[in-house]
Amino acid sequence: MTPDVLKNIADTLEARREAAPQSSYVASLFHKGEDAILKKVAEEAAETLMASKDKDKLHLVREVADLWFHTMVLLTYHGLRPEDVVMELHRREGISGLDEKASRKPTA
């Protein structure tokens, strides 16, 4: 997989964000709003956990793909792109997880 795949998916998601809800599954998710998107992300996360527990690698890969996709829908809903997440990962690269967590500002 190349980064182009993530960019292409993100571009498609952005195009579907303002599309008529009956035009596609993703457009209908955007139309239903954040709660529907969050529900789908949670559902895919749970399915990912179950696939892991089942030790079924192919099923796990497919569920992670679903989870990534729906997480990208959530990012698009908030006007974000995969590049924003990649930049954050670059920022954290080489930093101890404990140090990184300690450096975060508390959220209200």
Curated annotation (Swiss-Prot):
The keyword Secreted does not apply. This is Phosphoribosyl-ATP pyrophosphatase. NCBIfam families: histidine_hisI, PRK00400.1-3. Its main location: cytoplasm. GO terms for cellular component: cytoplasm. It catalyses: 1-(5-phospho-beta-D-ribosyl)-ATP + H2O = 1-(5-phospho-beta-D-ribosyl)-5'-AMP + diphosphate + H(+). Keywords: Amino-acid biosynthesis, ATP-binding, Cytoplasm, Histidine biosynthesis, Hydrolase, Nucleotide-binding. Belongs to the PRA-PH family. GO terms for biological process: L-histidine biosynthetic process. It holds the Pfam family PRA-PH. It comes from the Bacteria. Disulfide bonds: none annotated. The keyword Ubl conjugation does not apply. HAMAP family: HisE (MF_01020). InterPro entries: HisE (IPR008179), PRib-ATP_PPHydrolase-like (IPR021130). GO terms for molecular function: ATP binding; phosphoribosyl-ATP diphosphatase activity. Its EC number is 3.6.1.31. It is found in: Cytoplasm.
